[in-house]
């Protein structure tokens, strides 16, 4: 995590951790009832990785979580293999937002 933190700091970037799901709707009871829908599940995926990075020493100001639900599929959801590929977390460096001047 130290090399990642140094990389982000040197480049003036922050890390976006994005969570995704397949297109199967969440079902109460039979499926994973902890999440209301795919948006919530994808948010939890991203937050789990974000928290692990912070626990490993990445400053919390250098990382954020984003949820995409079933949007932006990388494979067809028509079969189990494609759905498995769509259930993922991605990480990408992003430009750090400009700081606003204090009034």
Give the location of each predicted region.
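Short beta-strand/loop motifs in extracellular/secreted proteins, especially
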Residues: 13
């Amino acid at each position: 995590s130290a090399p990642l933190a140094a990389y982000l700091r040197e480049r003036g970037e922050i890390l976006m951790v994005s969570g995704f799901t397949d297109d199967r709707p969440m079902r109460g009871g039979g499926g994973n009832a902890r999440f209301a829908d795919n948006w919530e599940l994808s948010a939890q995926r991203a937050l789990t990785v974000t928290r692990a990075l912070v626990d490993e020493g990445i400053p919390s100001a250098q990382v954020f979580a984003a949820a995409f639900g079933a949007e932006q599929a990388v494979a067809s959801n028509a079969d189990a293999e494609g759905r498995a590929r769509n259930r993922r977390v991605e990480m990408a460096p992003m430009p750090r937002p400009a700081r606003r001047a204090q009034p």
